[in-house]
Structure formats: C-alpha cells, structure tokens
Amino acid sequence: RWTRGITAVEPELIFNAEGVRPRSWTDLAGAEVAYLQDTGADLALARIRAEHPEVKWTPLDLASADALIAQVDDASIDYAVVMSSDVAIARNIHLSFDVAFAAGPKRELAWALPASQAKLRDSIDAFLDRMRRTGGIAQLTDRYYAPSRGLGRPDAGVLHDRIETVLPDLRKYFEEAQDESGLDWRLLAAIAYQESQWSADATSETGVRGIMQITEDTARQVGLADRLDVQKSISAAARYLRDLRDKLPARIAEPDRTWLMLAAFNIGLGHLEDARVLTQKMKGNPDLWNDVRKALPLLADPEYFAQVKLGYARGGMPVAFVQRVRSYYDILARALPPHVPRLRASTFDAVASP
C-alpha cells in the first residue's frame, strides 16, 4: 500500500551530450539503457521495458542515482533512465549529460508499506498532511532543489573551470577565515564568487571594492584599511558575516539562519528586520527564509515600505543574491571537502597528556 504523494516526479532518459540526442525509444533499438535496480526508476520502467524489447535494458546495482548520472556524464554509459528529481539535483554538478525525453508518465513520490501496516500508513498520511499544511514540504523542496534552479549550466561551467584555475590560490585565505569565524570556507568562497568572481581588484560603480565587494562604511566598521588586500578582505567579511549571524534571534535554526545572514549581508540587518516584520503581518514565519524572501521585494512597494521602520529598499536584490550564493555553495560543497582545522600543538599535548 502507498502513502499519500509527496511530490510529482517522472523517469527521464539521459544521454552524454557529446553524442546524438535520441528522440524516441525507436532511436534506441540495439542500444544499452541502464537503470538502477529495485528503485522507483525500475518500477516506472516495467511497462516500457515490456513494450520495447529492442532496447538492451541493463539493471545496475549502484549506491545512488548520482553515481549512475556520473557514468553517463563521463561516457562510461551511453544512456540511462533516472528520476527527474535526481536530474534536477545533478544538472549543475555533472555538466556533460542532458535529458533526451520523458521515459514515462509523472507519478507521485510516496512511501510503500506492507498492506498489514494500515495504522502506520494513516500516521504517515497525517504527518504528510501536517507538513504540507505548515509549509514543511515546501521548506524541504526549497532546501534540496532550489540551489540547482538558481543557476544556468553555462554559469555553472564557468564556476567549475575557476574552481580548478583560480580558487587554489585563494583557498588558504578562505580556510583561515573559517578558522576565525566558524563559517564554512566554501560558503565564504561562494559569497566571494557572487561578489567578484574571485577578482581581487573588482570595483563597482557604487564604490564597493575588492574580492568581497565591501563598502567603505563596512570597511571602517570592521577595521579594514585596504579593501584590495585579498587576505584581509576575506577575513574582514567573514567577521562581519559572523557578527550579522550572531545578531539574529537565537531561536532561528539552520539552514534559515545562514540564508537570513546572507540577506542581511546584501541589504543590511535593518531592512531584513523590516522584511521579517512584514512577513509576520502577512501570517508568515519571520524565522523561515522561504517566507521572508516573499516579503523582501515588497520593500520596494509604497504600500508596504510605508509600514516599516527604514522604508524603501530594493528588496528583490537580496533574494537574487541568496539564490545565487546557494547555487554556488551547492557546487563548491559537492566538489570540495570541508576544512578541518589542525589541532594546535598545545591543544594536542593537553589532550594526549595523562
């Protein structure tokens, strides 16, 4: 027996983009098409496999759909069928595969339970209803799928190239800033990429400068004399970000705390607080980024900015800023390992001594 549906997904045929895009199953006569055995894709393909015996169907026992997509991406496999939800997550990580066509109808993603577990199914259905009603499913969808929607593949390709060519010279500065601030070095790198594409001497028409695009006022606030000094700019920005994060109400949990910190970095803590006030007036949750981002653009609307303390602001900008940083961070976090600070000798000695 199935629980209520969570979200709609469909199986998709993917291929290596260096090859010829098939238009239908007829184009795949004699070709090998892989899929993950004992998964949703396996179930979704049951009828298709029976209707198209001319295709060489190959079930694989791999750890994840991402592992299968990676094999198509590096041309180890010509074709595969994976679910659209897995494609959405992987499309800016693996850049050499593409979707040829839908391999079956859309269906609701749900949990399967033994027929004897009616009580458990009812409990799960009640939980899913509550999650949908309170916005929990929308939050989870935003958390796991929003990063891949915020970036085009050409932009993702440029970032992948610069991870190899530019980032190695900067990485130590981001890691040092993590040691100082506690913020993931890959998040700091994502912010810097959004601000300057890792250009040390970037200068905007509004007067912000350097790799982190710090304003004069912020530079004075954090004691940064030279905004073009890469190491000091990254360190100063990390301290400033941590200060913004610490000023948010303690009850705000992750990952919303980080996304709200990013919005404050872009628009200022005061304007963010105005948006949170509007969020509450609109019966939203001011502690959830998914709700606050809907209120931020209203700061440019006279009907709404008249109701808040600081008035007008270009509230659409932090929404776009956070989305782009999340997209870059998603790629960096998948491509590069976290930084584990080394233990200082004195700390090691203290732990090792009897």
Where are these regions (language model features)?
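A ligand-binding cleft/hinge motif common to bilobed small-molecule-binding domains
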Residues: 1, 46-47, 70-105, 273-274, ...
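Ligand-binding cleft/hinge of the Venus flytrap
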Residues: 2-4, 41-62, 91-94, 157, ...
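Periplasmic-binding protein-like
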Residues: 3-21, 85-128, 151-156, 218, ...
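Extended ligand-binding regions for polar small-molecule ligands
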Residues: 16-42, 86, 105-148, 167-168, ...
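Short helix-initiation/N-cap motifs at beta->coil->alpha
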Residues: 20, 56-71, 256
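Substrate-binding/active-site groove segments that recognize
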Residues: 37, 201-225, 230-243, 301, ...
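Catalytic and substrate-binding regions of cell-wall glycan-acting enzymes that process beta-1,4-linked
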Residues: 123, 259-331
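Export/targeting segments at the very N-terminus of extracytoplasmic proteins
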Residues: 148-198, 231-234, 248-252, 338-341, ...
